[in-house]
Amino acid sequence: AALKNEGLTKGDRFTFLSKNSDEYALMYYAASKVGIVPVPLNYRLADAEWEYIIDNSDSKIVIVRSEEFVSRVHGFKANLPSVNKCICIDAKAPDDSWTDFYDWTKSQSEENPHEDIKDDDAVYQMYTSGTTGRPKGVIIVQSNVVANIGQVDKYIQRIPMPKNLLVAPVYHAAAAINHFGTIAKGGQNVIHEDFNPVEVAKTLSSEKITNTVMVPAMIQACVYMVPDIDKMDFTTLDHITYGGSPISPEVLTKAMGVFKCDFGQGFGMTENVAVLCFLSFDDHKEALASKPNLLKSCGKPVEGAAIEIRDDNEKEVPRGTIGQVCAKGPQVMQGYWKLEDATKETLTGGWLHTGDAGRMDEDGYVYIEDRIKDMIVSAGENIYSIEVE
């Protein structure tokens, strides 16, 4: 109601800047109900990048949590012509141009606004990291999110009412789909603002967590840095999913011994909601038993997705040959915000060109080798940075 009463209508954008917090749920679900599009902001970016994203997204409202972030946004908000209102959470308003979030929401009417939401209506607009220039706004719609939740659930569906520890940053695609998937199954998210290995281990045990998503470095920190972790009770923990990089056999072996749960790896990017490939629980067990090279893979395409490895001429290369990883599926984005040429280039022929250099083996497992932009050509041969390293 507060968003609607500020004059925002279906398709309008607003920015949310916060570390992990309960307000993320309010932001995503309340906005989605009325077709207003949240732009979750990476709190690790520099002020100039924040300013660019808020301005580029045409956000009409900015909601900011914490004294530090409010102070930083206040320093450049005069440069944001589209922003009509600034809202602060857990922070003192710098001046009367800011409004407290809970004062703002409590002052609204009790009406229950609703819009007719369609499959192709945007759920959120996340910005890429901008490794090849300015960050690009990725438009993800309702059908994309629903599809990816279902695709991932094929691997983890044995938990009917999950209790998920949300510790990865929710401005990130993987954590967002983890959040959505938990709620979709009637589960509960336990939210940590930041990653602290001791607190994570304590919460996994005391809150009887069933699953969580981390990166391998987080898993490693937990199993090697937490005192007496071997004495903690993790009997309710069913599985841990990780992403961002492969996990080493040593860390996986240690983690399986500590947590006594299954492990899975999801691979994807902002442009496909979160997950294109999945390295299953059984794959991890097989890797430790007899096929350690599997841990270098990011798995096989999830159900409903297709992956081809292509050369510079858009031709599929033989198995085992490195080329660009191209993907198609119901989770692939609609395009980039206000970037028609970049959208056409990235979605050439209806296939998402990921920018990743990879290969597929004879069994259908995908291996990411490099970024295409890091490749050089010498004497007609493609040379990847990892080969040089």
Q: Can you annotate each of these PLM segments?
A:
Residues 146-163, 171-211, 225-226:
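Conserved AMP-binding/adenylation subdomain of ANL enzymes
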Residues 2-45, 382:
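Conserved AMP-binding/adenylate-forming
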Residues 184, 209-214, 223-293, 306, ...:
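Gly/Ser/Thr-rich phosphate-binding loop
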Residues 6, 10, 17, 296-300, ...:
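Conserved ATP-binding/catalytic segment of the ANL
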Residues 123-147:
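Conserved AMP-binding A3 loop
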Residues 70-119:
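ANL superfamily adenylate-forming
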Residues 20, 88, 93, 108-127, ...:
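Conserved pre-ATP/AMP-binding loop-to-beta segment of ANL
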Residues 29-34, 55-56, 172, 181-184:
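Short hydrophobic alpha-helices that are characteristic scaffold elements of the AMP-binding
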